[in-house]
Amino acid sequence: MPNFVADFHIHSRYSRACSKDLSVAELAKWAKIKGIGVLGTGDFTHPLWLDEIKTALRETGTGLFEAKNGTQFMLTAEVNTLFYKEGKAHQIHHILLAPSIEAAERINQELEPFGSLSLDGRPTLRMEAWRLVEVVLGIEPRCLVVPAHAWTPWFAIFGSTSGF
């Protein structure tokens, strides 16, 4: 079986604590050097980053996108859901994967009322996790919603400090 390397949990320069030098072209260059077969775009929820994605990548019709150097990308974003249960705050990070620009744009339209998408590449949405899944899959059933860094203490579905 051939080896295949993918990284879907990545961020743009619009996320806190990330390099301001990040660009789609730089990500494509380094993915090629490191042997990554498919790289997530990260942060498709941020309007300026989505504009760059649309300019820098070509949609292939397979759910993947291609950079000028041939690097394959998948549309990804990380969001933080913030909700309260039994008087206790819970925050969970999720990775969203979308098969098309149209799906990403529709997701952004539906999520904007729950939190400003332009403040951070990893926006905080005031909604329960189940509602996020319902919204995203209701837009496009081929989308995926998966917990990010599930075992870390902070902002993880199984995290010791996530409020569960």
Q: Where do the language-model regions lie?
A:
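Extended substrate/RNA-proximal surfaces in nucleic-acid metabolism proteins
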Residues: 2-3, 51-164
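Histidine-centered catalytic micro-motifs
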Residues: 5-15, 44
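Generic enzyme active-site microenvironment
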Residues: 7, 41, 76
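Feature marks short, surface-exposed loop/turn motifs that line or immediately flank catalytic pockets
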Residues: 14, 48, 83
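Short, flexible loop segments at the rims of nucleotide/cofactor-binding pockets, characterized by
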Residues: 14-18, 121-124
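Short, acidic/polar
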Residues: 19-31
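Generic structural signal for well-ordered secondary structure
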Residues: 24, 46-50, 89
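Divalent metal-dependent hydrolysis catalytic cores, especially in the metallo-beta-lactamase
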Residues: 28-47, 144-146
